[in-house]
Amino acid sequence: MDWNRLLSRARPGLSRQHPDSEARTDFQRDFDRIVFSSAFRRLQDKTQVFPLSQSDYVRTRLTHSLEVSSVGRSLGAMVGDSVIRRHGLKGVYPQDFGAVVAAACLAHDIGNPPFGHAGEDAIRLWFTASATGRAVLERLTKAQRQDFLRFEGNAQGFRIITRLQSPDNRGGMQLTCATLGIFTKYPRGSTLPGAPPSGIAFKKFGFYQDDLDLFAEVAGQLGLEPVAPGAWSRHPLAYLVEAADDICYRIIDVEDAFRLQ
């Protein structure tokens, strides 16, 4: 495991990097690009858990994402301090770990449809229950069909930040490879040649067939280990994104429920 590669500041679609002397670090730039994106702003009207609440107290996906990012920044800085001391890293600081985890956390729900997992189920159903949806599937390869029959907000999120937001740029928002790798909790496509590897990182998929080459480029920059054709080991800091999300929804969602009693 090479932490210098895992914290790669390379950006897909860009051949140059910002000089270190600038006031903002690359990971802070990632955070700012996400904050000011229209895709992130759209989370303000998407349900976290409780839809159509008449109370302005209840969280939306937007406020949830901000809270997860705040927790992720703290977790990243704490883990970063330990990693730096253990591995003797030079030129890297705990706040760099905090900033990159915060950026990935900020975008972690950016691909979720309205109504969350229920929205994912509705999209999957449409492709089998409607004539129009079935007609779309007929024009796709077997592997591509699985992208829709198993529609996944995590994969849609990867597509949004790397293609749909700023579509004229290769790499979309052109976030750093480190942020993209940490964002991708499920580093595999919707189909694999054999049985998927065991483990939490492979229970879902994190990118569409059409985005496989781009993620392979990101994984190569980060030095992520291939575990099967079309699947890689998870970036170690991705576990902090998941932890921050769990901490927030297991406490805050209960708080919202209590408020709505």
Which residues fall in each region the model found?
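A short small-residue
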Residues: 46-56
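Sequence-structural signature of the catalytic-core scaffold of metal-dependent phosphohydrolases
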Residues: 1-23, 35-45, 66, 70-71, ...
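Low-complexity, highly charged intrinsically disordered N-terminal segments
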Residues: 59-63
